[in-house]
């Protein structure tokens, strides 16, 4: 077997890029950066197997309708740039729209790829008249943005936001500890609004997919038992704790003279088991380790 040289490998990849341009084939790359052109336009830089692909902002499908002008333009661009900053390292699809053979520079559209996927997965139907993605279906999604209490995913050409309460039945303080941009996750599509191809919206959750969510862990706790756990949130004097054995717990009282804070490790004593809500209720006997 002959070993492929780096130059030959580059030629094969360039051929894939040219095929995307001629035949409209979808390619997938990694969002590497955001730049301003000398004329002040924003372009998104995508890496495709070592080649630099430029995608103009209007081809990123981050907004619908015309770009606002005048006083509204600056806040709009600030919002776009902050969205793009959270999307760094995300996996995105694109179709090549133009290329320069000598300079090997490429311009592409994410919008074209997303519309193609929407048509295939949401609008085209099989013999029974059912599209590939329907309500209740579990599908793989790409994580394209993560904040403390929210996840942004792309499901075959449609973006959607999943809030913390829909991520898991277990309580956690920060989604960034569990998810990162570029991950692939299984989601359940809950609702689909198939207005027209440019305005398809969905809601989805991860909570109903993870089977651990359905079984209550309460039998791992006994009354008057003491357990170690970590504080996930503190709201209105109520402390929310994820015990190390997997049980969700709530404390209204803390015997430690210090105030518990997020991510503190605490010792928790169970005073009541709330079967209906699937949580343990009790008191924090002491703070084992503060997260300062």
Which residues does each predicted region cover?
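Single-stranded RNA-binding regions, centering on S1/OB-family and related RNA-binding modules
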Residues: 1-292
């Amino acid at each position: 077997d002959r070993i492929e040289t780096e130059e030959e490998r580059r030629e094969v990849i360039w051929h894939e890029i040219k095929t995307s341009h001629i035949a409209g084939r979808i390619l997938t790359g990694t969002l590497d950066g955001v730049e301003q052109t000398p004329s002040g336009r924003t372009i998104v830089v995508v890496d495709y197997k070592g080649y630099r692909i430029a995608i103009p902002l209007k081809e990123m499908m981050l907004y619908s309708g015309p770009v606002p002008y005048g006083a509204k333009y600056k806040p709009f661009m600030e919002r776009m740039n902050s969205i793009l900053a959270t999307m760094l390292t995300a996996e995105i699809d694109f179709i090549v729209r133009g290329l320069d053979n000598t300079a090997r520079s490429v311009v592409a559209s994410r919008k074209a790829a997303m519309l193609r996927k929407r048509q295939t997965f949401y609008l085209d139907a099989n013999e029974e008249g059912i599209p590939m993605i329907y309500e209740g279906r579990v599908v793989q999604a790409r994580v394209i943005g993560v904040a403390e209490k929210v996840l942004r995913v792309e499901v075959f050409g449609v973006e959607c936001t999943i809030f913390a309460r829909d991520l898991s039945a277990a309580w956690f303080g920060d989604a960034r500890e569990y998810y990162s941009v570029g991950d692939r996750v299984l989601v359940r599509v809950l609702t689909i609004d198939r207005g027209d191809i440019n305005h398809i919206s969905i809601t989805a959750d991860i909570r109903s997919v993870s089977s651990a969510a359905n079984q209550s862990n309460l039998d791992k706790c006994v009354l008057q038992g003491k357990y170690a756990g970590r504080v996930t949130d503190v709201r209105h004097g109520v402390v929310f704790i994820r015990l190390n054995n997997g049980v969700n717990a709530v404390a209204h009282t803390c015997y430690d003279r210090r105030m518990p804070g997020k991510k503190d490790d605490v010792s928790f004593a169970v005073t009541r088991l709330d079967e209906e809500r699937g949580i343990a209720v009790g008191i924090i006997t002491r703070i084992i380790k503060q997260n300062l």
